[in-house]
Regions:
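Short secondary-structure junctions
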Residues: 14-23, 66-70
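Short edge beta-strands and adjacent turn/loop segments
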Residues: 20-37
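Short, non-transmembrane amphipathic alpha-helical segments
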Residues: 50-69
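Catalytic "initiation/cleavage/transfer" segments centered on a nucleophilic residue
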Residues: 70-128
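A short interface-forming secondary-structure element
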Residues: 40-53
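Helical scaffold of the NTase/Pol beta-like nucleotidyltransferase catalytic core
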Residues: 1-19
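Short, flexible beta-strand-to-coil junctions
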Residues: 28-32, 44-45, 80, 125-127
Length: 128
């Protein structure tokens, strides 16, 4: 997973240089039967109701990840900056350029009401 996390850091850096900062960029590993990762993203320049936002993220993922790595991820979840989930993740930990924080799923499972085995927070940065 470490190699994939490094690739996600590259993806984040590339997208931020072209579009602006992310508020939140996280990976949640769902429990069986899925055993796949959800990509949780929030940025002021992304719109959860516009297909073009999803296409932009998906294209960058496909550009950087191998086909096998890409199949580990089941969906992209774009959240509005004022969403309560974004506020929760921003308050959980600050994660800046090049860092990440791993979380066990227990606390997140209780908060979000679905089973999360593991989570990585790759960006959590409040706007000034």
């Amino acid at each position: 997973m470490k190699e994939v996390l490094e690739k996600f850091k590259t993806i984040i850096k590339s997208l931020e240089s072209g579009h602006g900062s992310f508020l939140v960029f996280a990976l949640f590993l769902r429990e069986k039967p899925f055993e796949t990762w959800d990509i949780i993203i929030s940025a002021t320049w992304l719109n959860s109701s516009e297909l073009s936002s999803y296409k932009l993220i998906s294209a960058k993922l496909q550009e950087v990840l191998t086909g096998q790595e890409f199949l580990q991820f089941s969906r992209i979840v774009l959240l509005d900056p004022d969403d309560q989930t974004v506020k929760f993740l921003l308050d959980l930990e600050t994660v800046k350029n090049g860092g990440y924080k791993e979380f066990s799923g227990e606390a997140l499972t209780e908060k979000f009401k679905f089973t999360i085995k593991r989570a990585y927070l790759l960006r959590s940065l409040k706007q000034p």
